[in-house]
Every structure is written in C-alpha cells, then in structure tokens.
Amino acid sequence: MTSTFALVLLLGGMAVCVATGVFGGYSERANHQANPEFLNLAHYATSTWSAQQPGKTHFDTVAEVVKVETQVVAGTNYRLTLKVAESTCELTSTYNKDTCLPKADAAHRTCTTVVFENLQGDKSVSPFECEAA
C-alpha cells in the first residue's frame, strides 16, 4: 500500500512538471517585453556576441525582444529571439543599452541565441543564428 501511494505521488508530481513545462523542455515566457531581466539578457547577449565577431567595427544592439523561452537545467537556459541592428557605438567604446542605438540605415535581422546562467550567476552566450536581412 505504501509503495502504491509513493508511486501515485511520483507520477502525479511528474505530470504537474510536464504540464507546466518545467520538466526538460523550453517554456515560453509571457509578458517578456515588460520584463527588464529579459531585456538586460538580450543586450548582454547581443553586445557580447557582436564584440567577438571578426571584422566588425560597431556593436549590434537590440531593436526588439521577439520571444523568450526558458529551460531549467543546472541553472537556466534563456532562448532569446531578437531583432538586432548595427548600433552607433564602436567596439572600441563601452556598450551601453541606453546610448548604443540602432543606426538609422541599419538593416534589422532576426536572430536566436541561448544565454546560459549557472547557479552562481555566471553567463555564457551561444553563437547567434540570424536570418538574412
């Protein structure tokens, strides 16, 4: 009887995790555009990635956060879909989301990346995958 009860609890807990999207896969985040944490992650990812691109002279910047999905692992994966454009800030300067605005004539690209934040708060950015402008 005790083992049956434990099995029911285990299966019930797994069903809740699967239904809420906590168990394994990515979950889309609602109200992502109103959440400053996601905007800060988007700017962090975009500035970090663009600074590592050979031949670039200017940072890219975030024009829009299109979609945010999260996955809980040993930390959190944030899969970000962004519209990015070349900014007015040169790579020799310090990136600032408030002053590094898109150039007026810059093409906007839709890009996807994953930012992993471990349990200590350290972040890493996967390469961007962008659609042609």
From Swiss-Prot:
One of its GO terms (molecular function) is cysteine-type endopeptidase inhibitor activity. Residues 1-19 form the signal peptide. SMART domains: CY. It is found in: Secreted. InterPro entries: Cystatin_dom, Cystatin_sf, Prot_inh_cystat_CS. Detected in saliva (at protein level). Detected in salivary gland and midgut. It comes from the Eukaryota. Residues 30-118 form the Cystatin domain. GO terms for cellular component: extracellular region. CDD domains: CY. The keyword Secreted applies. Disulfide bonds join 89-100, 111-130. The record marks 24 as: Reactive site. Keywords: Disulfide bond, Protease inhibitor, Secreted, Signal, Thiol protease inhibitor. PROSITE patterns: CYSTATIN (PS00287). Disruption phenotype: Combined, RNAi-mediated down-regulation of salivary cystatin-L and salivary cystatin-L2 in salivary glands strongly impairs the tick's ability to feed on hosts. About 40% of the ticks cannot feed and die. The remainder show much reduced blood intake, appear unhealthy and display strongly reduced egg laying. RNAi-treated ticks show an impaired ability to suppress the host's immune response to tick salivary proteins. Its main location: secreted. Pfam families: Cystatin. Gene3D superfamilies: 3.10.450.10. Monomer. Can form homodimers in vitro, but probably not in vivo. Homodimers are predicted to be inactive; dimerization disrupts the interaction with target proteases. PANTHER family: CYSTATIN. Belongs to the cystatin family. Contributes to the suppression of the host's immune response to tick salivary proteins and is important for successful feeding on hosts. Inhibitor of cysteine proteinases. Inhibits host papain and cathepsin L (CTSL) (in vitro). Inhibits host cathepsin S (CTSS) (in vitro). Inhibits host CTSV and CTSC, but to a lesser degree (in vitro). Inhibits host immune responses via its inhibition of host cathepsins. Inhibits differentiation of host dendritic cells. Inhibits proliferation of host T-cells in response to antigen stimulus. Decreases symptoms in mouse model of mannan-induced psoriasis-like inflammation by modulating immune responses. This is Salivary cystatin-L. It comes from Ixodes scapularis (Black-legged tick). The lineage of its organism: Eukaryota, Metazoa, Ecdysozoa, Arthropoda, Chelicerata.
